[in-house]
Amino acid sequence: MTNSSPQVRCYGTIQIGDISLECVVLNDGTSGYVQRQLAHAIGFTEKRPGSRFRRFLAEIAPNSLSYFDKTSQDVIRLPNGATATFAPCGILTEVVAGVMESASLGTLHTQRKHLVKPCSAIYRALAKTGEAALIDEATGYQRNRAPDYLQNLFDKLLRESASDWERRF
């Protein structure tokens, strides 16, 4: 834990199917996730997946470790008073892209092959939602749309492409 823990400025949750991910924006504007929940969304079941999750990142998404290392030791205090380890925005995209790339190269471990379809669907949904967000920001439309429009768009896109596994993700 660092001497001065980053302060949470904004807090909310993202839904990926039936999984809720706590997300935060820190006072310095850095956005990200609660690491434990991010690891759970990817498929880790233990309560404190720390070192196992980092080994997984090193294998699947080594590029994510460089910016993850800058913040991975940051302990944040959530609005409910609990503390959590911060995982920066971009980790989810790096992981799903890493799984897809490993699969295409034939290097994905057999026990992780089940991750390919959900990761592909998450990646596409994130890309399309990001594209919509950029257009909304450029046009000013984000001030006119419902506050949960992007979350609903993401859910819709994910469910359209993932009906066979959506109960897990």
Language model features with spans:
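Positively charged, aromatic-accented nucleic-acid-binding surfaces
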Residues: 1-169
